[in-house]
Amino acid sequence: MGIPMRKPLLVLLVFLALASCCYAAYRPSETLCGGELVDTLQFVCGDRGFYFSRPASRVNRRSRGIVEECCFRSCDLALLETYCATPAKSERDVSTPPTVLPDNFPRYPVGKFFRYDTWKQSAQRLRRGLPALLRARRGRTLAKELEAVREAKRHRPLTARPTRDPAAHGGASPEASGHRK
């Protein structure tokens, strides 16, 4: 009686599967260059942003940039994380309240045509929760009125005509009436 051929073949296949998994886990990390590097950094760092060279406080190797590290050498997740900017505050972090300026804080215009009052009214309207439909309807009405005024100015006659016809009322020019006497 011999050993069935199926059992050693099954053992060999299982061994090859495990070996390939272990090799994939311990093989050197891949290299990233150009757009792939930027896309990967954006994915890893998210809202925090990233640097192409580490800030001075984080330098633990010779000052190489991320391009030299990831494009010419192997690049892994831990290395990518070192190039992320300072972490953004989490939503649960309430240690420092947001800065709120008092209403009497002096405000200075930013530009030549800056109208703080108009902006403030719009912001107050938004805070009150005025529906966008009403704001849009009011804006459309104002736009139609403005267009009507512009149209009226555009079609104004160049010379003004008298509203009454002088010949119809028997009134001729003063010179003509003076000759009748």
From Swiss-Prot:
GO terms for biological process: embryonic placenta development; embryonic placenta morphogenesis; glucose metabolic process; in utero embryonic development; negative regulation of muscle cell differentiation; negative regulation of transcription by RNA polymerase II; ossification; positive regulation of activated T cell proliferation. Belongs to the insulin family. The IGF2 locus is imprinted. Paternal inherited gene is expressed, while the maternal inherited gene is imprinted, hence silenced. Residues 1-24 form the signal peptide. Disulfide bonds join 33-71, 45-84, 70-75. The record marks 48, 58, 61-62 as: Important for interaction with integrin. Residues 92-181 form a propeptide. It is found in: Secreted. This is Insulin-like growth factor 2. GO terms for molecular function: growth factor activity; hormone activity; insulin-like growth factor receptor binding; integrin binding; protein serine/threonine kinase activator activity. The keyword rRNA-binding does not apply. Residues 25-52 are annotated as: B. Residues 86-91 are annotated as: D. Residues 65-85 are annotated as: A. InterPro entries: IGF2, IGF2_C, Insulin-like, Insulin-like_growth_factor, Insulin-like_sf, Insulin_CS, Insulin_family. Glycans are attached at residue 163. Keywords: Carbohydrate metabolism, Cleavage on pair of basic residues, Disulfide bond, Glucose metabolism, Glycoprotein, Growth factor, Hormone, Mitogen, Osteogenesis, Secreted, Signal. Proteolytically processed by PCSK4, proIGF2 is cleaved at Arg-128 and Arg-92 to generate big-IGF2 and mature IGF2. Residues 53-64 are annotated as: C. The insulin-like growth factors possess growth-promoting activity. Major fetal growth hormone in mammals. Plays a key role in regulating fetoplacental development. IGF2 is influenced by placental lactogen. Also involved in tissue differentiation. In adults, involved in glucose metabolism in adipose tissue, skeletal muscle and liver. Acts as a ligand for integrin which is required for IGF2 signaling. Positively regulates myogenic transcription factor MYOD1 function by facilitating the recruitment of transcriptional coactivators, thereby controlling muscle terminal differentiation. Preptin undergoes glucose-mediated co-secretion with insulin, and acts as a physiological amplifier of glucose-mediated insulin secretion. Exhibits osteogenic properties by increasing osteoblast mitogenic activity through phosphoactivation of MAPK1 and MAPK3. Residues 151-181 are annotated as: Disordered. One of its GO terms (cellular component) is extracellular space. Interacts with MYORG; this interaction is required for IGF2 secretion. Interacts with integrins ITGAV:ITGB3 and ITGA6:ITGB4; integrin-binding is required for IGF2 signaling. Interacts with IGFBP2.
